[in-house]
Amino acid sequence: MSLQVQPQVSLKPFNTFGVDVRAQLFAEAHSDADVREALAYASAHDVPLLVIGGGSNLLLTADIPALVLRMASRGIRVISDDGNRVVIEAEAGEPWHPFVQHTLAQGFSGLENLSLIPGTVGAAPMQNIGAYGVEIKDVFAGLTALDRQTGELRDFSLEECRFAYRDSVFKQQPGRWLILRVRFALNRVAHLHLEYGPVRQRLTEQGIEQPTPTDVSRAICSIRSEKLPDPAVLGNAGSFFKNPLVSAAVVAQIKAQHPDLVAYAQPDGQMKLAAGWLIERAGWKGFREADAGVHKLQALVLVNYGAATGLQLLDLAQRIQKDIAERFNVELEMEPNRY
């Protein structure tokens, strides 16, 4: 057996909140064979299997009575290249930001707006990660996943993934699909997305009038570094709440009290609000209780100042949800998966 299964392993190094809970069993998968072995092991020992990636979208509230399998497979390869459009495939365990930097170094554009997002390649399609006007669905060329119900491999097209805002079929059917590798359609001729004001502004400040994809990536990295704390320094899971979608009527109600509210019209007629703005306006920015808090610079980020438990962070999140619902009649949804 090549899979190394260890009992009673602390998951503190494997979640970016730095919450110290234990896995009943723990293993790392470096290949498809390891994944199948883990499935067989969990079945034979009658324990659940919980698959994790970089741990940047996890809130762990108790010890995990399961085999926790961390995807650690590596590998990046070009699948097709017609001179401009390049399809590149990466294994699920590849760290996301270094993968983005690799594609840029090869002269491929498309992922630059998704720079410095924590996590792994395999986790990216789960919630259709997005930033600065680009989502995974915009560069998606397919993926291969293992059906945990049948043990069969299946290739997914864009349509089959059912991507939506921070959502996908993989999130809608938790525990069924185990993503093994993902393919992206990138280009040598750049089509830059500079719709977001802060990105254009940063490039202008740097005196860059005709930016390259690498310039855009660097600008976004500098913006994100200023706004978001480094999980290696201060435990966090990035944006903790989704930006809520509400009706025009709700927007009108809030604007009556808060004329400076900014709302973004969506194709389906709904309006998207900035969750961070709502939380800050409600007075939570910089709040701290024991070691659980709201970041002092970015109200959308909950932080662990050292010894916060998952339950303390969850309690804080739920209090914020309750307050925002009562103040603004808006329901905030948590982004991290909770266990």
UniProtKB/Swiss-Prot annotation:
Subcellular location: Cytoplasm
One Pfam match: FAD_binding_4
Cofactor entry: FAD
Chief place of localization: cytoplasm
Active site positions, chain numbering: R166, S239, E335
Alphabetical list of HAMAP family matching this protein: MurB
InterPro entries: FAD-bd_PCMH, FAD-bd_PCMH-like_sf, FAD-bd_PCMH_sub1, FAD-bd_PCMH_sub2, MurB, MurB_C, MurB_C_sf, Oxid_FAD_bind_N
GO molecular function: FAD binding; UDP-N-acetylmuramate dehydrogenase activity
The protein's name in its UniProt record: UDP-N-acetylenolpyruvoylglucosamine reductase
Organism: Pseudomonas fluorescens (strain Pf0-1)
